[in-house]
Amino acid sequence: MSNQHILLMSNLLPVGSNISTWWNFGSMLLTCLAMQTLTGFFLAIHYTANINLAFSSVIHITRDVPYGWTMQNLHAIGASMFFICIYIHIARGIYYGSYLNKEVWLSGITLLITLMATAFFGYVLPWGQMSFWAATVITNLLTAIPYLGTTLTTWLWGGFSINDPTLTRFFALHFILPFIIISLTSIHIILLHNEGSSNPPGTNSDIDKIPFHPYHSYKDMLMVTTMITLLFLILSFSPDLLNDPENFSKANPMITPQHIKPEWYFLFAYGILRSIPNKLGGTLALLMSIAILMTTPFTHTSYTRSMTFRPLTQILFWTLVATFITLTWTATKPVESPFIIISQMTSIFYFFFFIMNPILGWTENKIMMMND
């Protein structure tokens, strides 16, 4: 440990020489976090957390504030970039067995939950139609809690419906949570450098380590530059690509949109929620879709850490990726046939991965022992 700290102080953080591009998403997430905090701060200067003024204040930012449209679009597209990076980051963790570093994995899942809460609160702030109705639907899930549900919902809303107090507290939460994310990120990175990164074969890197700078820092810069280029391409040519058309109308509690849905990065969880025709069951499945990630370090049965040399588990992993994409797609569709059955089947497949992963690990161990 002491040697690692000396190397760290000498700007020579030792990192395995064979980590691939999939390990670059951590630095990309850090870039997203810095950008979201900065653009969010500039937006907060001009934003007004009042149900009568919120929508107008966002229009004022995009029309009248110098470069306000840039800040607003960067913040909106940046959120999508953040989630693309975090989902790839988690997928890499599952594929290469990074979750066996338990402290790092569990702090990472805590970060994901905090990030999802932050994004949800942020989505409500423009006070557009979809903002309002998505907030109504999601916060209403609290009523599914036996005995305490209604009291908790009223407490969260600050009244008997979503109103001015709700928007004010959501803005306060959206402002404070990024600083909690920054703190958790620091803990996540400190815990990571306690043991160091894993690598594609899942072996010990101690025999072959190189300084982080200049080797991996330049490699990180390439991917960060690619991400920023993509961000500015979307900003310049199609800034509303990821926005919901309903959000261009001011929130109206009297008119319900035809199809209420959250932002695209929550659709996989929303698809799982919708596929269960029971409020409490759906809410539990929604929570479990994220919480189940915490089980992976404790259900690992394979002798090898990574999936690199485990073809059976690889098939299972890519099924999970296909399931995630299919769930996202079906959640954009109305609740009718055949989308109901597709959602239900893919929801089963999603949880099936976490049940089958330890079983397949054990099976592969048996196959390896037979070959010996």
Curated annotation (Swiss-Prot):
Membrane topology classification: Multi-pass membrane protein
InterPro entries, A to Z: Cyt_b/b6_C (IPR005798), Cyt_b/b6_C_sf (IPR036150), Cyt_b/b6_N (IPR005797), Cytb/b6-like_sf (IPR027387), Cytochrome_b (IPR030689), Cytochrome_b_C_euk/bac (IPR048260), Cytochrome_b_N_euk/bac (IPR048259), Di-haem_cyt_TM (IPR016174)
Organism classification: Eukaryota, Metazoa, Chordata, Craniata, Vertebrata
Family: Belongs to the cytochrome b family.
Species this chain originates from: Ophiophagus hannah
Record keywords, A-Z: Electron transport, Heme, Iron, Membrane, Metal-binding, Mitochondrion, Mitochondrion inner membrane, Respiratory chain, Transmembrane, Transmembrane helix, Transport, Ubiquinone
Record: residues binding heme b b562: H75, H174
Name of this chain's protein: Cytochrome b
Functional note: Component of the ubiquinol-cytochrome c reductase complex (complex III or cytochrome b-c1 complex) that is part of the mitochondrial respiratory chain. The b-c1 complex mediates electron transfer from ubiquinol to cytochrome c. Contributes to the generation of a proton gradient across the mitochondrial membrane that is then used for ATP synthesis.
Binding site residues for a ubiquinone: H193
